[in-house]
Amino acid sequence: MRKEKFNHGWVFHKGGGSSLEALAGGGTANEQPVTLPHDASVGMTRNPDEPNGSGNGFFREECYNYTKTFSLNPEDADKNIWLEFEGVYQNAFVYINGSYAGKCPYGYGNFYIDATRYVSFTEPNDIKVIVKNGVPSGRWYTGGGIYRDVNLMIADRLHLIPDGVQLATQEVEDGQAIIRVRSTIEYTGIGVRDIMLVTELMDADGNVVASDEMPITTEEHTKQTYQQKIYVENPSLWDEDHPYLYTYRTYIREGENAVDEEIGTFGIRTLQLDRKHGFRVNGKVVNLRGGCIHHDNGVTGTAEFPHAAEFRVKTLKEAGYNAIRSSHYPMSRRLLEACDKLGMYVMDEFADVWTTTKVDFDYGTHMAEWWEHDVSNLVRKDYNHPCVVLYSIGNEIPETGNKFDSQWGKKLADKIRELDDARFVTNSLNLMLSIMDRLPKMMAAAGQGENAEVGEINSMMTSLGDMMGALIASDVAGDAIAESASQVDVIGYNYATDRYEKDGEKYPNRIIVGSETYPQDLDKNWELIEKYPYIIGDFSWTAWDYLGEAGIGKINYEETNSMSFYAPYPYKAAYCGDMNLIGDRRPISYWREIIWGLRDKPYVSAQPPQHHDDPHNMTFWSLTDAVRSWNWKGCEGKPITVEVYADADEAELFVNGKSVERKKIGEKKKFIAYFETTYEPGEVEAVVYKNGVETGRDKIVTASDDVQIKACADRGCVPADESDITYVEIAMVDANGNLNTDAAKDVSVSIEGPGVIAGYGSADPASEENYFDTTAKAYEGRLRAAVRGNGEKGTITVTLKADGCQDVQVQIEAK
């Protein structure tokens, strides 16, 4: 099967909400050429009055049309033609040469269009994709349009179906791996054909290490699945530390010719799950150091590029993560490939809703009719990726507490096991939603009043405060989800640490994962994980900041009785990630790394002194407002709180060489010591001790006000064909290279040569700047630009300018 990107030559315009209007060419006045992937929403002007408001980050939800004219080779007239759309948000209707060819309501799933009957091999073809995204449909920033790749696939009438080759490790023992290969062959022609099905497995150097040939007689108009076994001697195993990938080639040979083939990568590894050991990979116990992520990439929106995916995974691995949860929808192919390559375990999630909608026009309006199609495509997409170890069938599903509606869980789990028996199934339960219909009476019994408000789940959790733990730990909640828990291999608990020990005793066969947890709770969660093998890991909300759910991690410095969950305009980001929007580590990520036992060196940060005496109203999704900075201009002589993170007994703080205090670590919060001192420019240093012996030190210094722009590309080249991006990292530094977080300068960007700026901005969660503006204000001293090729080869020059700074140029080769 020939597979090629189908991303070039598209024309985009807004409007055309009805298919009739779109087919009639409505809205063509504002059309523009685009190359996919393309997030149609991220460049739009945000609106404070947007109906979905904070949930969508005040970005607009609109309808879009994409059109393209293409030609096919007449020599392929006897071939089958498919199009794969890896992601279109949402309600995509596909028309080819004016005829309806197919649709997919789900905005996060990949889908296929069999275009064979609709295309011409002698005349140009027209394709139109109508995207109906004009209504609120998500609880976070969804993006819009064709935001992932489109692929054109051409194959003989006798062919392997798309994603039709599935490899699974059945056993690894005594230096030998047994690999099962299932291949689905379709024959849409006539007559009988005698063929040979061949599978070869090649090592990283391209050497064939195992193979099998199977003779097959194919009959007309059939689709059959065939199974082979191949034996690999002395296999190199895939895991987080050694992500070794083999290449497989499965092809149909007829005579001396290869009629069709599929080539891909595969990792040999075994998975085990039990109460005694917990989760094991290749026989070794693995505790999942996990984080949840959404699908946007900050300044480029939801458009998915290979380098953006690799950058995210690499950054998270460097911060100590070994697992990510794709929340709350199927992970992109690019991200799966990055996780395979770099060694990151994945919990891939089906959906945020089943049949009960959370937003008026979300996937819940289609799930009952489309779930089998979408689950099947999820599993087919994931099957050969060794990184995927868990499938989650849902997130915070209210139906899980209803004895009739919870049967959807059984349907989903059974379907996944039918399609893939080599992985484990979980369900990410929020017990507050599972018992929502019982909450008024439970709250009345607890003295809250039977008319207490029950509404949007995150706001409700915030308003209930400490009472939520008691409700979650109650027998009523446990009984409500008992059947749902029995349907899966691992029960996922969202914000239910209070059940871990209780359920471990009550249910001797239950295995638990913290599928979504408060970032501030990792210290106590990890202690339980290390104590009880049946708790296999923790996935914090979130590993990476994201657009939408604006302000859930903010700290409010004003006196207020409001327990408002979201922040008002101009907030656009959640501001709750270990990594900020542009991928820089925030202090909490170092605290997390220390808890995991992966960092020996202490870490110093400071809370903004301008808010020292203000109230600190925090949500559950924040731990601190500390910044790694000793630049607080205008706050000289004012009190300041310094935080020291360390796995040690004591910490001593020095300001400009003078000892402030020596105190125990963990008195208020495990692995943290808080110091009160007075801000003086210069340097602040922490020295930590175990058993009275110094074990490490860390310091931060004041950068001078005479800052310059420092910029560098994170790689020296970018594909000329527009298929990927390269990041340019920008920082405001003094002559000694020290970052000045106070330097909120406006920095302009321009580009010369064969490239374009695909997104530019900072991590500011409340910036009003558009990511396609040419000027952006540095936030905490940093910015990031994404550079994309424009189809030509040559040298791209990115120029950065700011008042009082020398111009800086960065060169990137488009190859």
What are these regions (language model features)?
Residues K3-G17, N56-G57, E61-D163, Y187-G189, ...:
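Accessory beta-strand-rich segments of carbohydrate-active enzymes
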